[in-house]
Amino acid sequence: MENTIEALTGRIINGEAITHAEALELSQMEGSALFPLFCVANRIKEHFVGDKVYLCSIINAKSGRCPENCSFCAQSAHHKTDAPVYSLVDEDKMVACAHEAEKNGSSCYGIITSGTSINKGEELTRICRAVKRIRQETGITPSCSLGIIDYETALALKDAGVETYHHNLETARSFFPNVCTTHDYEEDVETVRVARKAGMKVCCGGIFGLGESIPQRVEMALTLRELDVDSVPLNFLNPIPGTRLENAVNITPMECLQTIALFRMILPSKKISVCGGREKNLRDLQSWIFFAGASGTMIGNYLTTTGRAAEEDWQMLKDLNLSAANCCD
């Protein structure tokens, strides 16, 4: 298998895309055979995106009361959780958190809201005002994740200064009905297309450990390749009490790393970040993400769960002799 991996690596570096069948073969590797996979995934990453690390941070700008029934989500109105519930925060709060994110070393800052979408009145106006101020007052790059949007909203965000629109597919099309039944997968795909049409970059990934099969992870990666997204956040389920998946078993650290490597093999030139759930799922192997193909991570807190201190992540990078890159590079 090592010879096969080496041959695939050469083809990928020369600009060829691996096939669905080849990706499935890689997904079946296990045990010590995974180490050569991590090694070549790292080589591919360094060839296409270098060895620097992209750091991002977010604000949960509007929390809870979401009408969607995503099985993993603490903010769904269909679940009874301890997640905070509040309306869209004010402009000053969004800007202040951007300053804090920049202070912590992030180069990209995401404004995230719960719900299917935002309204085009006061909510959109407030977010656009905040984005303009963030552009004026900081050196951080603003992004937004506001749910399903239409072209008019996408243009307004682009005009305000939003660099990247974030919208996850969450999982493979074939598994999506097991995760969410309140909207269709194609609506998420269309949002990605709309954001790109408006001139924004697109950050689009998903969450693993929902009960999907490893071949379905490959399926999702191939969909992202077809959509030609710019960056891919990989999240790993941190089961929240009160959600449908509260009793789910975490996937192993090695399976997390294998998933990262698979995505790098399928999406060689994309920015791939490991975000939510890394502390819970990777545990002592968190630092290995950067040697399995990841090129970034989120620092600070997540939407409804606490991340570790930014100082700890900076120490991790220092120990690995890695430095941070600007997300616009």
Swiss-Prot record:
PROSITE patterns in alphabetical order: RADICAL_SAM (PS51918)
Known pathway: Cofactor biosynthesis; biotin biosynthesis; biotin from 7,8-diaminononanoate: step 2/2
Enzyme Commission number(s) of this protein: 2.8.1.6
Catalysed conversion reaction: (4R,5S)-dethiobiotin + (sulfur carrier)-SH + 2 reduced [2Fe-2S]-[ferredoxin] + 2 S-adenosyl-L-methionine = (sulfur carrier)-H + biotin + 2 5'-deoxyadenosine + 2 L-methionine + 2 oxidized [2Fe-2S]-[ferredoxin]
Protein keywords: 2Fe-2S, 4Fe-4S, Biotin biosynthesis, Iron, Iron-sulfur, Metal-binding, S-adenosyl-L-methionine, Transferase
Pfam families assigned to the protein according to its UniProt record, in alphabetical order: BATS (PF06968), Radical_SAM (PF04055)
Record: residues binding [2Fe-2S] cluster: 143, 203
A biological process from GO: biotin biosynthetic process
Cofactor note: Binds 1 [4Fe-4S] cluster. The cluster is coordinated with 3 cysteines and an exchangeable S-adenosyl-L-methionine.
GO molecular function, one term: iron ion binding
Cofactor(s) required, per the database record: [4Fe-4S] cluster; [2Fe-2S] cluster
Superkingdom of the source species: Bacteria
UniProt: [4Fe-4S] cluster binding residues: 66, 70, 73
Location of the Radical SAM core domain: 48-278
Quaternary structure and interacting proteins, as annotated: Homodimer.
PANTHER family: BIOTIN SYNTHASE, BIOTIN SYNTHASE, MITOCHONDRIAL
Similarity section: Belongs to the radical SAM superfamily. Biotin synthase family.
Protein task: Catalyzes the conversion of dethiobiotin (DTB) to biotin by the insertion of a sulfur atom into dethiobiotin via a radical-based mechanism.
The protein's name in its UniProt record: Biotin synthase
Lineage of the species this protein comes from: Bacteria, Pseudomonadati, Thermodesulfobacteriota, Desulfuromonadia, Geobacterales
